Every structure is written in structure tokens, then in C-alpha cells.
């Protein structure tokens, strides 16, 4: 899913949440909840891969020390999380950056409805398409 284009992810969620889709009875399409689902689908693989890489590196570094102290996997996890807290914070910031820069999936499932589902990135896209570049630039800053 990490390489899935955002518009395709939005289309898949659209198909799931549309009235004829399996989750259509919940009426989530064109709501902020649908936008959150789209964002979660896009950033979850990135968060998982980066977190795994960070913690796997620590695991390899601390494995012998933890075993010599008699720590099993469940006792090692808090140590790894504590020592990897800055790496995990960086992972969360990377996920936030990815989510906040997203336009495609959010526009497909949210609809860019003024006052309801319009967010900064979709507003920038709208103003750019209308030719109001000064406003689009101002929104970006």
C-alpha cells in the first residue's frame, strides 16, 4: 500500500463507502470521517515501515545486553520504546507531514465541501484551478 497513488486509495475508499458499497449504509462518504479513513489508509504503511526499521535497529543493538539480563521479549519492549522514542517521534512527524500534504484521496472521499470537508490542501487546489494564485499562495503560507 505504500506505493499506492493517493487518488487510487481515495477511489477504493469511495467504492467502499458509496451507497452501493459494502459500507454505504453508514453514510460516511463526503464526511470528515471518510477523510480520516483515507488519511489513515495512506499513512499506516509508512508509519509501520519506518517504525519497524527504527525498532529493528535498536533490537539488533540491544539484543545481547537484554538477553544477558534475562529480559524476554515482553520485558524488552518498554526498553526499546523508551530508547527509540525520538526515532518514533520522527516517524509520527513524517506521517503527519504525509497526511497534511495529501490532496487526491481527501478530495475524492471528502468532496471539498465548503465549511464541512474543505481543508487547506483542497482549498489550495481549488483556488489554483480557479486561477486565484495569490490566494492559493497565501493559503500555503
Task: List each language-model region with its residue ranges.
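Membrane-water interface segments at the C-terminal ends of transmembrane alpha-helices
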Residues: 1-56, 80-103, 127, 136-141
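Juxtamembrane loop-helix boundary motifs flanking transmembrane segments in multi-pass membrane proteins
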Residues: 25-28, 72-76, 80, 112, ...
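Amphipathic cytosolic juxtamembrane alpha-helices at the membrane-cytosol interface
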Residues: 58-63, 67-90
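Interhelical loop and adjacent transmembrane-helix boundary motif
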Residues: 109-141
